[in-house]
C-alpha cells in the first residue's frame, strides 16, 4: 500500500515539474516536428526511387510489346514415311 502511494506522489511531482518549464516542451515539440518532416522526406524519396527502378527494369525486360523474331530451328520435323517391303 505504501509503495503505491509513493509511486502516485512521484508521478504527481513529475507532472508538476513538467508544467513548470513550457519552453522545454516547445523545444522538444520543434525537434519532433523537424524529425517528422525529415522522415517524411526520406520516405517520399525512397518511394520515388523504387518507382523509377521498377519502371527502368520493366523497360529493360522483354515485355509483351516487343517484336517477334524468327526462329533458327523448326518446331516440327517432317516425318519420312517409308513403305514396308512386300
From Swiss-Prot:
Instruction: Describe the subunit structure.
Output: IgE Fc receptor is a tetramer of an alpha chain, a beta chain, and two disulfide linked gamma chains. Associates with FCGR1A; forms a functional signaling complex. The signaling subunit of immunoglobulin gamma (IgG) Fc receptor complex. As a homodimer or a heterodimer of CD247 and FCER1G, associates with the ligand binding subunit FCGR3A to form a functional receptor complex. Associates with CLEC6A. Interacts with CLEC4E. Interacts (via ITAM domain) with SYK (via SH2 domains); activates SYK, enabling integrin-mediated activation of neutrophils and macrophages.
Which organism is the protein's source? Macaca fascicularis
Task: Give the protein's recorded name.
Answer: High affinity immunoglobulin epsilon receptor subunit gamma
Gene field: FCER1G
Record carries keyword Membrane: yes
Q: According to the UniProt entry, which residues carry Phosphothreonine? A: 78
The segments annotated as topological domain Cytoplasmic are 45-86
The entry's cellular-component GO terms read: external side of plasma membrane; Fc-epsilon receptor I complex; Fc-gamma receptor III complex
**Which ranges does the record list as Extracellular topological domains?**
19-23
Which is one Pfam family of this protein? ITAM
Instruction: List locations, semicolon-separated.
Output: Cell membrane
Q: Name one GO biological process term.
A: innate immune response
